[in-house]
């Protein structure tokens, strides 16, 4: 159901016509337990495909409220996908800056670095994909200094101790 809701969130970006009020209204019709994944999908669609101006993206971030780490995680995934495709565009930069407070390159680096750390944190029954998403949200929430912890093309992973500390903090019940 979670992956379905992430896809549904992506579709809301298009169906809602890039209108934050329409998108928020649609999300509020769903049970609270599904909203995190919906916001994640919206963050990915907004950042990957664009279509919104800075005011609309800011309003979307504001409207996400307590779900902001999820919309930010979606933006990080979008930056990672654009980076891997060698196809960074201005809308990806805009989405990353406004939804998660990172440049598109920092977000792409975060996406790659946290993926490398999944083996250090996936000691639960949680699927690796969900551990990866959780790590991204944790880094965003902690406001790690990416210039020190995630150097561009460093070829090295974040220290396992840092990943474990981040996961310990992220294990606190998420909204």
Question: How does the language model describe each region?
Answer:
Residues 1-175:
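Mature, well-folded catalytic/scaffold domains that follow N-terminal targeting or propeptide regions
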């Amino acid at each position: 159901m979670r992956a379905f809701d992430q896809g549904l969130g992506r579709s809301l970006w298009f169906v809602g016509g890039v209108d934050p009020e329409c998108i928020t209204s649609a999300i509020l019709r769903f049970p609270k337990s599904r909203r995190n994944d919906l916001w994640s999908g919206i963050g990915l669609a907004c950042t990957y495909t664009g279509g919104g101006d800075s005011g609309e993206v800011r309003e979307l971030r504001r409207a996400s409220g307590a779900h902001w780490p999820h919309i930010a995680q979606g933006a990080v995934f979008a930056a990672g996908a654009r980076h891997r495709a060698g196809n960074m565009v201005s809308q990806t930069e805009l989405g990353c800056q406004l939804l998660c407070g990172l440049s598109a390159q920092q977000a792409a680096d975060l996406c790659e670095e946290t993926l490398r750390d999944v083996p250090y944190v996936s000691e639960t029954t949680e699927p690796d994909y969900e551990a990866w998403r959780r790590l991204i949200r944790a880094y965003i929430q902690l406001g790690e200094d990416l210039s020190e912890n995630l150097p561009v093309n460093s070829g090295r992973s974040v220290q396992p101790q840092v990943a474990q500390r981040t996961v310990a903090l992220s294990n606190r019940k998420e909204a």
